[in-house]
Amino acid sequence: MAERPPEDEAPQREPWDEWVVEVLEELKEEALKHFDPRLLTALGNYIYDRHGDTLEGAGELIRILQRALFIHFRSGCAHSRIGQSRGVL
């Protein structure tokens, strides 16, 4: 018989929706450093029109912002070390 920890001793996790909101806020702050706020507002409005105020919409916005930031950094953003030659800070 395998030992299992008592269920009440598991680490507490924050609710999923709170985590999504926190991640989205962090991505928004970072995106505002690199992209035109009008573009981000238009993207947010587009997602809202398609999904409303839902976790599905928030998830899609997170995926889009992550990809946009990655591509931006990878293509040589001056604020990032990603995509730069070794030894260059």
Curated annotation (Swiss-Prot):
Q: Which GO terms describe its biological process?
A: symbiont entry into host cell; viral penetration into host nucleus
Indicate where the modification Phosphoserine is found in the sequence: 80
Q: Which Gene3D superfamilies match?
A: 6.10.210.10, VpR/VpX protein, C-terminal domain
Identify the main location.
virion
Q: Which residues form a coiled coil?
A: none
The subunit structure is:
Interacts with human UNG.
Q: What is this protein called?
A: Protein Vpr
Which organism is the protein's source? Simian immunodeficiency virus (isolate F236/smH4) (SIV-sm)
